[in-house]
Each structure stands twice: as structure tokens, then as C-alpha cells.
């Protein structure tokens, strides 16, 4: 087993160290991940809507030609030109902008959530790769140790202190461990493919992992209060705010729209007549109001907004309960991983002592190779469980980091 560093440090979850190689992988993943890019594009699309809602209604132009020219005192009317512009009630455009801004803020939280999830997935995959590689190294060292025992057994066979069966048992054990190394090799390739998929690159791109990981013996106290600023919950707050802005916009849309216009009528001169207004064109400024008399649509919208807010509060509570449960589980699982690591470290020390006793027996002229195999198997079991404890410790720390920062 490679050197496992046991160092008393305080693991600040807000500055959890992933190791330089993992940090580089995370940087690559954040730059290339299509899901993050999708949410960023959606966010930009909502922001662009602000330019759309800034616009006022289209200006109306009209032209009319009198097929039968009506006679007036000043002459016959020939054609009519008109222009009209409706303007929303005061504050309506601002209300639309505020609504779009609130929607954009909610969309932005999707980016933060996607980034957190990607970091967590990359980290967990990385620690799985570390575990597989570390197990392979442990098995290789155990095989080397078994080969040493095999040589000892062959020497004992020559002196009549061991049988050929002992040698065969050791060789069978070596074959079993070599088979496990091969299986782990395929598992590593599978996990490497998963990592490269998360990084949006070719599946056979080689991943390098750390040779050792630091395991902490003390941790910060983490509670449910740490969840308050989690983007999965902030998203509900911002969606709630967007519904509030939607209702303010709904109230503005119940107000009348003001219209300003101008009519121009071309008038022909009356023949054989002379007076000051003969043929004088008509110019008529106009003001109009568009009033939503039937407001059932807006009343329904108000009720819908209220129900939507209630739904969001329930959704937030459900998600908060789930995240709280996840955090509590991760905290306790991490503590359990540390306990398991310490226990297996003690067991390894005992197994090493037993192994030394057996080796001294060999020096004195006798050794029980069945006991050797038993001790070797025990040591391998403790080493494997210790690696699993390290993996669990870091994976649970990743979950805590995802939830509490």
C-alpha cells in the first residue's frame, strides 16, 4: 500500500482541497460542459428579452381616399392621413423589465447548480479512480510478498519442513490477486471513460490521479443553516420573486393605455369662390384611452400567481428537507469513514506484528504457511477496507462541500 498520510488538520469545507490535478480537471470541465453552456445560453436569452419589452406598441398609420368627395363649407375633402401612437401606463415598461430581470436571476441559479453538480461528479469519479489505482498497487505489493513466501516455501520443501501443497496454495493465491488486478484495470478504464465524458473529451484520454490523499482527524461543525444559501434553494426564492414581479406587471396591465394621434384631411378649393378659408386643409390632434373594462383575465392571473407562490413554497420545503437529510447522512458517513480508517490502521499494525512473529518462526527453522496465508489475507482485507474508508471520507466530503458552500 502506498503511503497513507495521516495528518491532523482542520478540513475547512469552504476551501476543500481537491489536489492540483483534480482542480485542473474541474477547470477543464467547467469550460467545456455542454449542460453549463446550455444554461448560460438560456440565461443570455432571457436577458435579451429586456430589449424586447422596452418597446412600445407599433405606431399606426392610416390613409383614406374619398371615393365620393364630401362637400364642406371650405371645399371638397379628397383624402385623409392619420397617425396614432399608444403608450403604456406609467411604469408598465419598468414593470416588464423588472419581471424579465427576476426571471434571469432564477435562470442564473441553474448555472450555479450545474457547476456544483459537475464539480461533485468529477470529484467523486476522481476518488473512485484513486481507489481503483490504490487497490491495484496494494495487490501488486501483496503479490510480491507472496512470491517471497513462495521462495521461502520452496526452500522449506527442500529441507522437508514444508510440502509442495504449501507452494501450490501460495501460487493459487498469487493467481487470484493477479486476476483481481486485471478486473480493476477494466474498472479503471470504465471510470476513466466516465471522467472524460464529464470533461467532454475523448474517452481514452489518460487520467492521472494523486499517489496519496490526506485524511483529516477533525472537522468543522456543519448544520442545516449552511443550506440557506444553496443555489437549489435560492432558485426557489428567485422564482418566488419573479412571480411577485409578474403580479406587479399584471396590475400595470390593468391600467389604461394612452394614445396620441393626428388626423390630416386634404380639402380642395371651391371653384368660383373667394374667401379666407377656401380649400383650407383640416388638421386634428387626437387623444385616446384604451381601458380594460373586462378584467376577468387579470383577476384570474392574480389568483394563478398566488397559487404559484404557494406551490413554490412547498417545493422549496420539500427540497430543503431532502438536502438537509443528504447533509446529515454525509456528515455521519464521513465520521464513520474516519472511524473505519482508524480501526483498520490498528488492525494492520496487529497483523504486521503477527507476520513478524511468523517470520521469526521461519528463522528458527519452522513456519506454518497456512498461517502465512491467513495473515496475508487479513492484511489485504484491512488494506482494502482502509482504501474504501478513504474513498468514502472524500466522497462524503464532496457531498458536504456541494451542500454547504
Stretches found by the model and what they are:
Residues 38-50, 114, 118-137, 148, ...:
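Amphipathic alpha-helical coiled-coil segments
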Residues 101, 164-172, 303, 369-377:
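Short, charged, amphipathic alpha-helical segments
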Residues 194, 209-213, 236-253, 257-263:
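Membrane-embedded hairpin module used as a gating/binding unit in multi-pass transport
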Amino acid at each position: 500500500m502506498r503511503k497513507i498520510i495521516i495528518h491532523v488538520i482542520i478540513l475547512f469545507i469552504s476551501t476543500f482541497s481537491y489536489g492540483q490535478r483534480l482542480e485542473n480537471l474541474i477547470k477543464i470541465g467547467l469550460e467545456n460542459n455542454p449542460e453549463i453552456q446550455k444554461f448560460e445560453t438560456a440565461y443570455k436569452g432571457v436577458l435579451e428579452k429586456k430589449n424586447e419589452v422596452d418597446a412600445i406598441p407599433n405606431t399606426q398609420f392610416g390613409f383614406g381616399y374619398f371615393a365620393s368627395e364630401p362637400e364642406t363649407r371650405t371645399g371638397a375633402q379628397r383624402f385623409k392621413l392619420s397617425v396614432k401612437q399608444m403608450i403604456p401606463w406609467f411604469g408598465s415598461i419598468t414593470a416588464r423589465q423588472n419581471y424579465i430581470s427576476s426571471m434571469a436571476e432564477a435562470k442564473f441559479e441553474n448555472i450555479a447548480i450545474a457547476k456544483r453538480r459537475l464539480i461533485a461528479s468529477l470529484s467523486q469519479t476522481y476518488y473512485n479512480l484513486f481507489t481503483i489505482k490504490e487497490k491495484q498497487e496494494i495487490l501488486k505489493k501483496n503479490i510480491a510478498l507472496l512470491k517471497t513466501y513462495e521462495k521461502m516455501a520452496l526452500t522449506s520443501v527442500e529441507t522437508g519442513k514444508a510440502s509442495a501443497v504449501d507452494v501450490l496454495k501460495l501460487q493459487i493465491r498469487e493467481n487470484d490477486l493477479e486476476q483481481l488486478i486485471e478486473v480493476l484495470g477494466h474498472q479503471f478504464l470504465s471510470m476513466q471513460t466516465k471522467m472524460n465524458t464529464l470533461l467532454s473529451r475523448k474517452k481514452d484520454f489518460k487520467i492521472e490521479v494523486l499517489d496519496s490523499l490526506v485524511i483529516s482527524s477533525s472537522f468543522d461543525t456543519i448544520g442545516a443553516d449552511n443550506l440557506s444559501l444553496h443555489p437549489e434553494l435560492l432558485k426557489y426564492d428567485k422564482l418566488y420573486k419573479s412571480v411577485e414581479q409578474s403580479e406587479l406587471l399584471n396590475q400595470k396591465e390593468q391600467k389604461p393605455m394612452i394614445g396620441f394621434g393626428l388626423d390630416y384631411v386634404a380639402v380642395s378649393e371651391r371653384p368660383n369662390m373667394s374667401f379666407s378659408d377656401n380649400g383650407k386643409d383640416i388638421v386634428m390632434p387626437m387623444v385616446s384611452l384604451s381601458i380594460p373594462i373586462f378584467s376577468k383575465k387579470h383577476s384570474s392571473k392574480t389568483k394563478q400567481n398566488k397559487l404559484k407562490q404557494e406551490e413554490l413554497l412547498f417545493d422549496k420545503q420539500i427540497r430543503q428537507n431532502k438536502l438537509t437529510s443528504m447533509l446529515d447522512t454525509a456528515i455521519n458517513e464521513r465520521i464513520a469513514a474516519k472511524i473505519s480508517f482508524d480501526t483498520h490502521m490498528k488492525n494492520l499494525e496487529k497483523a504486521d506484528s503477527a507476520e513478524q512473529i511468523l517470520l521469526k518462526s521461519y528463522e528458527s527453522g519452522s513456519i506454518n504457511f497456512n498461517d502465512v496465508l491467513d495473515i496475508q489475507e487479513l492484511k489485504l482485507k484491512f488494506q482494502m477496507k482502509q482504501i474504501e474508508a478513504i474513498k468514502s471520507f472524500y466522497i462524503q466530503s464532496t457531498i458536504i462541500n456541494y451542500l454547504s458552500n
